[in-house]
Amino acid sequence: MTEVVAALIWEGETFLICQRPAHKARGLLWEFVGGKVEPGETREEALVRECREELAVTVSVGEVFMDVVHEYPDLTVHLTLFHASIAEGVPQKLEHNDIRWITVEEIDQYEFCPADEVILDRLRKQNRSEKGARYAGLYLR
C-alpha cells in the first residue's frame, strides 16, 4: 500500500485544488496538493515537502481531516488529508497543469481523482449542515 498525504488548504470560503499533469496517471484530474511519503519521513514532513516542491509554499500542518484507502487498478493508496494553512508564499504551478481556489458549491464543476470522492462528499455534507446552522442563527467554526 502506498502512503500518500494531501492538504486541505482554506482561504476564506474557498479551498485549493490542483490539476494533475496530462502525462501522469490520472492525468488532468483534480486533486488536493500532496504526494507520497518517502522512507524515513513523517506524514507531516512529507506534506510540507510536497507543498514546497509542487506549489513553492510553506504550510503549517494541522489536524487530520480524513483517512481514505482507495484501490486503483495500478495501486492501492492510503491517503491522509490534513488541514493545512499557507505560512509563507503564494501558490505557483510548479508541477500541476493548473491550480484553483474553489468553493464547496463548485466541486461538481471539476473531475477529481476517485480517491478524493469520499472526501468531497464529507465536505459537501459539512457545508450543508453549516449553512443550515447559519440559517438557524447558529454560527459554527
Regions found by a protein language model. Name each.
Residues E54-V61:
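Short secondary-structure junctions
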Residues M1-L16, K36:
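Conserved N-terminal beta-strand and adjoining loop/helix that marks the start
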Residues T14-E53:
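Conserved Nudix-box catalytic region and its N-terminal flanking loop in Nudix hydrolases
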Residues A46-R52, V64, F82, I99, ...:
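Hydrophobic packing within well-folded, soluble alpha/beta domains
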Residues A115-R141:
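Charged phosphate-binding loop/patch that engages nucleotide di/tri-phosphates or the phosphate backbone
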Residues T58, V68-V90, R100, L123:
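Active-site-adjacent beta-strand/loop module that shapes the phosphate/pyrophosphate-binding cleft
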Residues H83, Q92-L123:
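NUDIX/MutT-family hydrolases
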